[in-house]
Each structure stands twice: as structure tokens, then as C-alpha cells.
Amino acid sequence: MPSAQTAAERIAELRSEIDAHNYRYYVLDEPSVPDAEYDRLFNELKALEAEHPELVTPESPTQRVGGAALAAFGQVRHEVPMLSLGNAFEEQDLLDFDRRVREGLDLPAGDLFGDGAVVEYSCEPKLDGLAVSLLYENGHLVRGATRGDGSTGEDISANVRTVRNIPLKLHGSGWPAVLEVRGEIYMPKAGFEALNARQLESGGKPFANPRNAAAGSLRQLDSKITASRPLELCAYGVGRSDGELPDTHIGILQALKGWGLPISRELKLAKGVAECRAYYDAIGAKRDALPYEIDGVVFKVNAVEQQRELGFRAREPRWAIAHKFPAREEITELLDVEFQVGRTGAITPVARLKPVQVAGVTVSNATLHNMDEVARLGVMIGDTVIVRRAGDVIPQILGVIAERRPTDARAVHVPEQCPVCGSAVERTQLIKRSKGRESVSEGSIYRCVGRLACQAQLKQAIIHFVSRRAMDIDGLGDKIVEQLVDKGLVRSPADLYCLTHEQVIELEGFAEISTRNLLHAIDASRKPSLARFVYALGIPDVGEETAKLLARALGSLDRIGRALPDVLVYLPDVGLEVAHEIHSFFEDEHNRTVIALLRERGVEPQEQGDVHPEFAACATLPDLLDRLNIPHIARTGAQRLAERFGSLEAIIAADWLDLRQVERLTEKAARSLRDYFDKPENAERARLIEAQLREFGMHWESERKAAEGLPLAGQTWVLTGTLETMSRDEGKARLEALGAKVAGSVSAKTTCVVAGPGAGSKLTKANELGVTVLDESQFIERLAQLGS
């Protein structure tokens, strides 16, 4: 046991450090250490104060909950303090809690399996968000507040009123005249990912995790910002109540649910500590599948009378405990950074860490993604870093604890030569191509230029090529691929089809039967579907679904290989980024050679032939003009130009006077169009696109000819609202394939309107005009009747 003087010094250090962390966490919304590190510091302080009670002061962090409220908000005094819960980190902590509950209720002690007098506990996940108090008077929401320091919080009434699942007026009847609801406001995982995507798109700083995002959103002085954030409430209890409530915790939560307040769908009653342990294991197993982040489960004595009997201690109720999951964030030392080479040659930094337990697993490596991420984190070799591991996700470094940086820390540098093959490493600037705006820098990537001469790239390329979703060559596992490459038997995917019996049987682990089986599997893969073959090629950004789309839409490898980016983007879900990746892949001489060798050696993907009718009907002259991104020519202007001139050549040839005759085309737009096509490269680009559309059977003139005699020829349809079984683009394509014209507005000439959920003014106008309206199920039935 340390002396009183030594203990006093350590206690002072701990209080200072904890107070600094509290300030960053509660006031600045910028946590500086993981929860697990904070808990260790707090528990050390708590233990020292227990050994030296004479050193306890009212200002100690152990004597209060959290930190002070932000000065920018009004202050709210909690009539019933919002206390935090004690924590259980190990199974024994939970058993000790149950023992203390039994002793407090004067019940017989149970054994390790909970035998003895049974205590009933409510069980629910511990959501990772911000605790709030919602005050209802006569059923109306009158105030919302944060927990703050447990006694005083922040008045965030305007902000909580923007959270969509918080009722502004209680439902039903029987609620107390005054009811204070306690709950957690959190951000679902999907909403968090979408918010961060928007932050990055707008140049903003992404949030570290959903908890920070929820807390930051609720502490906005402008409630309009809060309203734009995907926040939700989960009620978990009641503070003040002027009226009768059920006599169990679960009963109270069910009452809240009846009054319109959301509660956990995972709420459960456990009879005894053994069932609590089973609940903890069950929630832990489904943790990653839940739509929100949790960091443990909460157990509460279910009977309210027993809660009163057990009472409180200084910081927490005696009748509740939070059983935490193993920490998903920890701190450790960055020992080194090594570089790996991926299938496309990308050089990726990998952190080598001092081994640390994270979420129950020893972690010694973590991804750093790329050098832009290294720069963003400001990480150096020797730093103390925060590491996170969640589910099957590769551990990653979240941040650096800068104040712990050693004096001999070293910067991270990309090697000039590939660490595997020694080829040069080149830096490539990534470009984001977006319709209607200039290309902008999206960071950079370092690549080994060795291609398949680099064994790391070759091995990964072969592993991908033979995988189950690609060529599906059974028996060619990673270790066998490594042998084939290391022995020089395979230098490209095409070499697989030249392997002999003599070569294979010499491989480690092979005998006569396994050799015959592997050669048979290779031979059986010579006629893959076109989609499988395209996926197997390993085109950057082309996954299994995109490969299926390319095969279905374009029908042949030759067509896919020759398609211009401006034509590829007519396919649903293929944007400019992916279109350029596909085009660049097939333009590459080396890739063309590998494909030619595969075909020479008997690999023939099974092609479907023509362009699929749904996609053949996608292109229109207005759409082509719109996709050229001519300044000041919007979609409506493109439509009027097409109606006035009828062909691309006529538009290219139109002079100033001709253009000024186009209805409602401004002088600025006419001048911009003329300036655009006066540049030969622009006119050539437009002609090349049109020529390929015509060659592929996707030209609008082909569509008009094909439409003659189709069942919906001459009809005009409108799609409005959300379609749940298909995208709007797919619905449009299927209608156009049947000869219909799909318009963007409803008029007296409209034949039919398809209205999904969320249909608005178009549906109203259709009803006013007496236009036929179909819901989605009727629409699908009509398509089926017409053979689509």
C-alpha cells in the first residue's frame, strides 16, 4: 500500500488527468482516450480513495457524474439526479453485484449458477449515445435536458423536439400529470455512415463514432442542424413522476411504450443471475447485427419496491449495473509501419503494434488504409495510438495521443521501391469525376508498377481469379497458388490452363487423385458465364453485382471492352468513376494480352449476344446533350434543343440565329452551346458517343423503329414516389422497352401514373385530371402481363 504522501500525489495526478478527459469528452465533444483507459484511471482513483478516505474531497471525480454543462445553453436542475451506473467488466463482477443485491434484500445467498432465492432483473442493451431527460406536463413535452454532471444539465428543448421518434404529445391515456422520461439519444449505424459521407462530400470533418455524432448533434445551438441529423431516442426509465406507475421496471417501460415512447426491442426479464449471463452472451453474439452501437447490457432489479429498499450510494444505484463488453478501443504503442502490396499494386501501410487485448482478441497489426490516412492522423512510429476492433472488421488506428509522443518518434515514409519485387513505386493522384462539376482531387495512392511481374500482385490476382464467385476452380486454395507462383509455373491467369499432370503432382500435398481432380476443375472452368469472367478479371471497383450488370446489359465481352465511359454510364449504378476504371482496364495493353491468351487456351465466356432491350431503350438525344455537361444547358434546355433540331448533327451545325429560335433558350445558353461545339474535340466526343450508341443498338432512332408495334407504343407514363421492388431507373427502362414514353410531369396527355409511397403533387394532379393510377403491385402485374 502506498504511503499517504505518495497516494496524495498519485490521487492529485489522477484527478487532474480525469478532469482533463472529462472536459474534452463532455464540453469539447472530443474524447482523448478510449473508454477502457478512462475506466482504468477512474477505478485506480476510486481504489486509492477507498484506501485513504481522509484524502477524499467533494471535488473528486468519484463524487459526481461527468462534467459541467456548456455555458451556451440554459441550465436545468434535475429534481431527481441522473446518476450513472456501476460497471461490471468480468463475470465475477456480475456475480458480486447479484450477491450484494441478495444481501441488501436479506435473501439467501445463491451459488455460481444463481440457485437460491431468485431476483428478477430487467435486461436491455446499453446504447452508446447521450443520456437525456424529457419532461412531460399534462402529456405535452415541455423540456429536454442533458444529464450534464448528474445534478445540472443543459436545456436542449429545441433540439430534442426535432428528434423524430420523440412524441411531442403522449399517446393514449393514464399518464401522470408530470412525467420525466429518461432515455438515450443515439445515431443508428446507417444514419452515421450517411452523415459522414455527407460531411466528406461537403469538405467537413467526419465524426469519429456514432456517440460523438449524437452528442455533437444535440449540442448544436441551431436546432435546424440537429433536425438534419438522423437521431433516435430509446427510453430506459423514469425520473420524477406525479402519479401512479406500474410496480416493475419492465411494466414502466411497457407503459412508456403505450404512451408513444420508443423502448428497446431487446428488453427481456431474467429470473436470476444465470439468465442475466445468458442474455449478456446472446446480445454479445448479435452485437454487430444490431442497427445501433452498444457497449454492454444493463441489468436492473425489476421490482420497484426492491429498488427503493436497495437505494443508492454516492455515485450510482445499488439496484442496477452495466455489464460492459470487452473494450473495442484500446491504447498501445506503434512499433513500426510495414508496406503490403495488393492485387492492383496498391502499396498499403500496415501498423505493427505492441500486442494488446481488444474486444477479447490479441491485436498486433492494424490497417492504416493509405498514406493520406497516415497524414490525417499525424501518426509517427513510436506513438501511443488508439486502436479499435469491431466484429470481423480489421483493427484500425483511430488516433494518436500526442502528449505521449516520445522524443525519438519517426515519420512514416513510403518506400521508393516495391518491398516485394523491387519495381518502382509511383504516386497516382485520385480524381473524383462528378456530373456537372470540375474533377477534384480525392487524395492519392501509391502503386508498384511491376504488375504481374510482382509476385505479390500475381498471387492476389490468381487467388481472385480462381475464387468461388469468379472462375470457381475447386481445389486451388491460397497455399497452392503460392506454390504455383513461387515455382514459376504460373505467371498470369492464362498459365493455369497450361498446367500438366507432371507439374501439379510435384506440388506439396498432391497425389494422383488430387492432381486429377485439380486438372479436371481447371478444365471445367473453361466456359464460365460472362459475368463470372468479367468479375474474375479483377477490374478495379467492379464487384460481382457490377459484373452481372455489365454482362446482362451489353451481352458480350467485346462490347464491354470497347464501351466508352460515356456509354457505360447509361447503365444503372455505373457512375463515371467506375466507367473510367472499366474503360482504362480494357485499354491497357497488358490486360488485353492476358485476355487474348485466356481465349487462345480455350477459355470462352458464355455470351448473351445483343444489348438487353431494357438498356437499349435508355439513350435519348436530350439525355446525351445533358450528359455532355455543356455549361448553361440544363435538362429542360436539352429537351427543347432535341425537339427543335431532331438530331445531334443538326444541333452541332446550328448557327447563332438557329439557336435563338429555340423556345426559352437564353442568349447565354445559346452562346455556351455554340462555344462548346466550336471546339473540334467536343464535337468529336459527341459524335463518338452517338456512333457507339448506334452500333450497340442503343440509339434513339433505333428505339423509335423498335417501338412500332410494341404494346405501350404511343403511351406516356409517369413514375412518382418510391418503388420498393426496383429502382426508378429500372421501372423507366422496362416501360421504355415496351414502347412507352416516360415523362417527368403529369398532363392531360398522360396515359398512366405509377404511384409508390411518398407520391405527392403528381398523384394529386393525376387524380384531378382523371388519369389512371396504379400502385406498385398493380404496376408489376401489368408488366408481367405485357411480358416484361
From Swiss-Prot:
Name of the featured protein: DNA ligase
Chain ranges of the BRCT domain: 707-788
Residues annotated to bind NAD(+): 35-39, 84-85, 124, 147, 184, 300, 324
Binding site for Zn(2+): 418, 421, 448, 454
Job of this protein: DNA ligase that catalyzes the formation of phosphodiester linkages between 5'-phosphoryl and 3'-hydroxyl groups in double-stranded DNA using NAD as a coenzyme and as the energy source for the reaction. It is essential for DNA replication and repair of damaged DNA.
Cofactor: Mg(2+); Mn(2+)
A GO biological process held by the record: DNA replication
EC number: 6.5.1.2
Xref: SMART domains: BRCT, HhH1, LIGANc
Secretion signal span: none
One Gene Ontology MF term: DNA binding
